[in-house]
Amino acid sequence: MYNPPNNSNSFSNVDDDALAAHLKISQYEEFRLTDAVRPAMDLKIKPSQGYRHDVYVDDETGAKVPVIMAAASAEILFPLFMELVGRLGPMVDVVLETSHDTTAGSHTDMYRDHIDAPVLASTLWDYEDLLMNDGCTGIAVLNPNTPQEVQFDEHKLLIIYGSPLEPFEFNLEQRGVHCCPDMRFITEAEHIHSSSEQLELRFDQLRTELGLDGSHEPNQEEDHGFDFQV
């Protein structure tokens, strides 16, 4: 069931047939979406492939961290994510992110330190369906010694933190994801997250397999998205 939170969004006054037709659209030109998210009805931001550079500023320290934000078409997205993770080294930390059973605009982070990268990679491949198609699940893999991080968020965007970024740019360009300084992402406008009870069960299985039954931390963040449960 889809239930818009207010009357001031592009989904207002849209009948069920029009909404259903919009949700079925999985490709815009050459860009294929996963099942996790859909753009606004008004398509103020049309999904497309590319990346841009940005800067993350730590609220506490004021430190500036270089960032790459990227969107990739579904057919190359997960292999690209795994290639980026492979650059982090043989031992990594992992953060599993979920907005299952949370209030709108928030998610819960679950932490696991010191996991062998090959072991993690094998597990992530086993859960490719969940990570690609659940709009309530995201994951971040990081090397705290570098420090660098690769995030595959709930919107299925790739976000890379740290320096140097050139090796990650190489992987992006090699896959046909090119730099676009004016790139805009689906997160910068209204959008719909999609999930299901089956995917929530898969999330619980992944959480258990990664040993993430503890170390939960709520995280409040701004998001223009609405949840859609199927």
Regions found by a protein language model. Give the residues of each.
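Structured alpha/beta or helical-core interaction and ligand-binding surfaces enriched in interleaved
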Residues: M1-L157, Y161-V230
